[in-house]
Amino acid sequence: MARIHGRTIQKDHNDADDHDSVIAHLEPDILECEVKWALESITTNKVSGGDGIPVELFPVLKDDAVKVLHSICQQIWKTQQWPQDWKRSIFIPIPKKGNANECSNCRTIALISHASKVMLKILQAKLQQYVNRELPDVQAGFRKGRGTRYQIANIHQIITKAREFQKNIYFCFIDAKAFDCVDHNKLWTILKEMGIPDHLTCLLRNLYASQEATVRPGLFATRGL
């Protein structure tokens, strides 16, 4: 059991999510052009992760970076096993309003290896192709080309129609911190039901197995959790 940033995290080590799995039927190999695209899309001026490699190094290395990272990503793609360094994060609590000593008054950012972001972006792009087919038009959160204005326009249209036909209308606004409360095993089941290839789900599953993190509230970091 570990207490991180005021929230208790408990993992049952007999849970299936802890065991690395391998799928025999693989999706098509990762291309060098995909690695190049991922490198070019990584935001610069970001703090390095635990490996200390700055993101600004990649443009300097150019084609050499593409070739090396393509080899690493392809190895992960085939074996479905991630380097442990890519499973490590550094949590930095950022105070919001109120007492900064209260964990609930802080938001957390996670620093990860910039090299790992290449593989993550490629995996995200492949998953997005399947997810976009399943999501309804009203789902705007975390979708490219959609945002608050898109939802406001939808609400305006709904209100207009309700008034036109003299219908009652009710709105329920919920703001819940649910991103870290998702049951992973249920998530894998849902992805399978959505038609996501087992290979992609396996990569995600093995990424989240044996995750490690340190908390850096100031100049010093805690031991790995």
What are these model-derived regions, one by one?
Residues 87-102, 129-131, 213-225:
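Active-site-adjacent bridging/hinge elements
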Residues 120-121, 128-142, 224:
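Electropositive, glycine- and tryptophan-enriched low-complexity nucleic-acid-binding patches
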Residues 176-225:
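Conserved polymerase palm-domain catalytic core
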